[in-house]
Amino acid sequence: MESKSHAHCFRAQRVLHGKQWQQDAVVTVDENGTISAIESYDGQRHADAIPLGPVDLMPGLIDSHVHGSQGCDVMDATHDSLNTMSRYFATLGVTAFVATTVTAPVAKIRAALAQVAKSKHDGVDGAEILGAYLEGPYFTEKNKGAHPTQWFRELAVEELEDWISYSDNQLLKVALAPEKTGALDAIRYLDAHGIHVMLGHSDADYEQVKAALAAGAKGIVHCYNGMRGLHHRDPGVVGAGLLHPHCFVEMIADGHHVHPAAIDVAHRCCGSRMTLITDAMRATGMPDGQYTLGEYQVDMKQGVVMTSSGGLAGSTLTLLRGVKNIHRWLNVPIEQAWLMASYTPAESLGIQHQLGSLEVGKYASMVAVSSDFSIEKTWVKGRLVFDAATSPRQEALCI
């Protein structure tokens, strides 16, 4: 095979090409880390192809809502923490993530946003940092979750400008409660600046959520959790989010936050708009014990993290485990479950033309997956960032 000096051609037993499987196929990656060809294997033309063995090549997973792992958190505001998270995620098939903050004093949020931007610019060793997700401080008390109310703030465009500035224009998403004063103006402002607004930690009614979505909001935060639920006389945040044809629906598929049957109901309503997330915090991949989530001290027992008052406080889910759960609970093909954690997150961020599926012209952010669903290799934009043959697997550590 003729190729450019730094191009590579990988052969796998199957390649998830777009949304369909291609048997015994090769993926050619150019020197820029972009996929230049996906085609059936030909012994003569692909004589130099790197044989990956009996694996499936699939798009890298994208965690669009994650706080931490391995004892580290975005709110640490350090490169070491973000890099540790990045390396850990790569071992589990995640090739990109959105670093998510929590409600905290303004100075701490500013520091976290600034560090996310710096680490994205400087680069990390594993999964790439796509940008920042501001989760809080624009919530309301009734469905606060693990967000301390003393640090809640009122919406003001000037403050939104401040967050954007501290993030060096790397702020991708903002979560807010649509019933707050000034919410619609804030949504319109953020939408005009290309920042995706998610609705959550909210007691808004159906009409308020409909108005927010009409104003430009793009989705709802971890569906069912931290929001007014679905009632036959009051459809609430859940009902509005599931019904709106363009609303992305975040879902934590760990079996603790949402019952599998409720996930099935949501999926039957929103279909491909369901976006698998982890909402994982620093206890992910760690033993049971005490940890911090923002300003809270929390306890993890058997992988479930709770506040002292008994509320859930983030998760210890991995995106790979979430995909497995969806595949099993909803009885959908593995490729369909996988795309809920790769293509749909990319689409929700408006980057589906770059990431989320394996197609010509997109980045070669991809993973080699064995028959037992373990990750063998992970590439980010054509660069090998994890190889199970030389590094320990991590999934066994994760709850």
Swiss-Prot record:
Substrate binds at A146, H147, N225, G226, R233, D254, G255, H256, H257, L312, A313, G314. Its EC number is 3.5.1.25. A divalent metal cation 1 binds at H65, H67, E135, D279. The active site is at D279. It is an enzyme of class 3 (hydrolase). The keyword Zinc-finger does not apply. Binds 2 divalent metal cations per subunit. It catalyses: N-acetyl-D-glucosamine 6-phosphate + H2O = D-glucosamine 6-phosphate + acetate. Gene3D superfamilies: Metal-dependent hydrolases (3.20.20.140), Urease, subunit C, domain 1 (2.30.40.10). Pathway: Amino-sugar metabolism; N-acetylneuraminate degradation; D-fructose 6-phosphate from N-acetylneuraminate: step 4/5. Pfam families: Amidohydro_1. Keywords: Carbohydrate metabolism, Hydrolase, Metal-binding. A divalent metal cation 2 binds at E135, H201, H222. PANTHER family: N-ACETYLGLUCOSAMINE-6-PHOSPHATE DEACETYLASE. Belongs to the metallo-dependent hydrolases superfamily. NagA family. NCBIfam families: nagA (TIGR00221). This is N-acetylglucosamine-6-phosphate deacetylase. The gene is manD.
